[in-house]
Swiss-Prot record:
This is ATP synthase subunit a. CDD domains: ATP-synt_Fo_a_6. Key component of the proton channel; it plays a direct role in the translocation of protons across the membrane. It is a multi-pass membrane protein. SUPFAM superfamilies: F1F0 ATP synthase subunit A. Was identified as a high-confidence drug target. It comes from Mycobacterium tuberculosis (strain ATCC 25618 / H37Rv). It is found in: Cell membrane. Belongs to the ATPase A chain family. InterPro entries: ATP_syn_F0_a_bact/chloroplast, ATP_synth_F0_asu, ATP_synth_F0_asu_AS, F0_ATP_A_sf. One of its GO terms (molecular function) is proton-transporting ATP synthase activity, rotational mechanism. One of its GO terms (biological process) is proton motive force-driven plasma membrane ATP synthesis.
Length: 250
């Protein structure tokens, strides 16, 4: 009976909603996404300002060029494919965007509504299935567009379905449809599970709640970084597969 009462107190997956232009939107997700986007844009302008326009590169430019080259070499050696020049910057941008949106939830920013109920102001956007599906579909459309640009409007679908064995075309089709689903649910599931654990920790007595909460918040930073990295790495892999040509196998 006690477990049932405690379970009923857990509110996970609840979002603050509003109606905009006849559509119901999750305002907490919009807020977290907007803040993360503004931080990414501000960071990009800051780094761009640090990059010199002369022939002599500065320290910041050399640092990020070295990191980019090292990341490209490691990923190419791991997946055995060459990466198009525009893919890595896109993947890094997605990584930073997801990372910041995940880490915003760690900030202790709360507010109390008129009913005296205290809730987190900044929630992880990845705990909203709409957010992760939008990201996954964006990646899905982008790498197929890149594949059509590289292989042609006819060659890309043929290569996509045929693969290396013609008889596996139905399996390849199912695999392709499953990519955005698995990409989104992997991120959503891990972040959503973190929200459940935080809700469970909130049911602890106040005098001991701080300890497990602090430990989990620290671990949550690690989980958010790992999930953002996996999403970005799979983005690179999908782009490489979509743009792969027969003569590039090695």
């Amino acid at each position: 009976m006690t477990e049932t009462i405690l379970a009923a107190q857990i509110e996970v997956g609840e979002h603050h909603t509003a109606t905009w232009l006849g559509m119901t939107v999750n305002t907490d997700t919009v807020l977290s996404t907007a803040i993360a986007g503004l931080i990414v844009i501000a960071l990009a302008f800051y780094l761009r300002a640090k990059v010199t326009s002369t022939d002599v590169p500065g320290g910041v430019q050399l640092f990020f060029e070295a990191i980019t080259i090292q990341m490209r070499n490691q990923v190419e050696s791991a997946i055995g494919m060459r990466i198009a020049p525009f893919v890595l910057p896109l993947a890094v941008t997605i990584f930073v965007f997801i990372l910041i949106s995940n880490w915003l939830a760690v900030l202790p920013v709360q507010y109390t509504d008129k009913h005296g109920h205290t809730t987190e102001l900044l929630k992880s956007a990845a705990a909203d299935i709409n957010y992760v599906l939008a990201l996954a579909l964006f990646v899905f459309v982008c790498y197929h567009t890149a594949g059509i640009w590289r292989r042609g409007i006819v060659g890309h679908p043929i290569k996509l379905l045929k693969g290396h064995v013609t008889l596996l075309a139905p399996i390849n089709l199912v695999e392709e449809v499953a990519k955005p689903i698995s990409l989104s649910l992997r991120l959503f599931g891990n972040i959503f599970a973190g929200g459940i654990l935080v809700a469970l920790i909130a049911l602890f007595p106040p005098y001991i709640m701080w300890a497990p909460n602090a430990i989990w918040k620290a671990f949550d930073l690690f989980v958010g970084a790992i999930q953002a990295f996996i999403f970005a790495l799979l983005t690179i892999l999908y782009f490489s597969q979509a743009m792969e040509l027969e003569e590039e196998h090695h």
